[in-house]
Amino acid sequence: MADLEEQLSDEEKVRIAAKFIIHAPPGEFNEVFNDVRLLLNNDNLLREGAAHAFAQYNLDQFTPVKIEGYEEQVLITEHGDLGNGKFLDPKNRVSFKFDHLRKEATDPRPYEGENAIESWRHSVENAMRAYVKEHYPNGVCTVYGKTIDGQQTIIACIESHQFQAKNFWNGRWRSEWKFTITPSTTQVVGILKIQVHYYEDGNVQLVSHKDIQDSLTVSNEVQTAKEFIKIVEAAENEYQTAISENYQTMSDTTFKALRRQLPVTRTKIDWNKILSYKIGKEMQNA
């Protein structure tokens, strides 16, 4: 092990550490970071070399954060990244600094977004927040309005998690939805992601995703938002139902097939008569 450590350059050590951090299960960033810190045994190298991994993890996981002075949380996503460690809270129209290691928001300042699309963004946000409140008890959503390649685009992100470390499991739901504001009809594109880690007497992870495409009729802001939420609700309900059904099927078939119902002898042992068996006598005489 010592020989291997001598062969690895600092760059290679940081690259390996960054991979561990980026792939940390939901709710277990600190545990993975502390383990990597012990292995690397060089705090300055870890902080400087793996800073991009801290940021990538939060962006990928849609990490929710609360800004002091504001009631609701906002998600850390690539769509709100303003550069130089600053992010956008489109609901409250503020920018803020985000510490990717401590996961803290500071220095909120007024920020003017794209006013031309704000009425659309606001309508979708109101509808999306009502939907998330109904379906995700711990859910957070952030809705952006941006011009991408000359097209006015709405992007809605949802995050919901349950961290149950004392029960040896953690899980997170993420979904991202986009559509452009074009006359008559437009295409809705979504991606749904589930990640769950169970680690009592074992180590099992569920990592699943599904891509969605559908068409949306574009009329006024409020009606379009309602129709958009119908698409979101139908797709997410269908996905969650399919996941549950697959697990039930696996429980009834696949997992049972992994274990013999009878020993190789095809005969069950009567433990009450164990002493009458040869093995029982051998154990008794041992």
From Swiss-Prot:
Residues where Phosphoserine is found: 9
Keyword Iron belongs to the record: no
A GO biological-process term: actin cytoskeleton organization
GO molecular function: actin filament binding
Cellular component terms per the entry's GO annotation: cortical cytoskeleton; F-actin capping protein complex
Keyword Phosphoprotein: yes
Leader sequence segment: none
Chain positions with N-acetylalanine modification: 2
SUPFAM superfamilies: Subunits of heterodimeric actin filament capping protein Capz
Keywords on record: Acetylation, Actin capping, Actin-binding, Phosphoprotein
UniProt function note: F-actin-capping proteins bind in a Ca(2+)-independent manner to the fast growing ends of actin filaments (barbed end) thereby blocking the exchange of subunits at these ends. Unlike other capping proteins (such as gelsolin and severin), these proteins do not sever actin filaments.
Assembly and binders: Component of the F-actin capping complex, composed of a heterodimer of an alpha and a beta subunit. Component of the WASH complex, composed of F-actin-capping protein subunit alpha (CAPZA1, CAPZA2 or CAPZA3), F-actin-capping protein subunit beta (CAPZB), WASHC1, WASHC2, WASHC3, WASHC4 and WASHC5. Interacts with RCSD1/CAPZIP. Directly interacts with CRACD; this interaction decreases binding to actin.
Family: Belongs to the F-actin-capping protein alpha subunit family.
The protein's name: F-actin-capping protein subunit alpha-2
Provenance organism: Didelphis virginiana
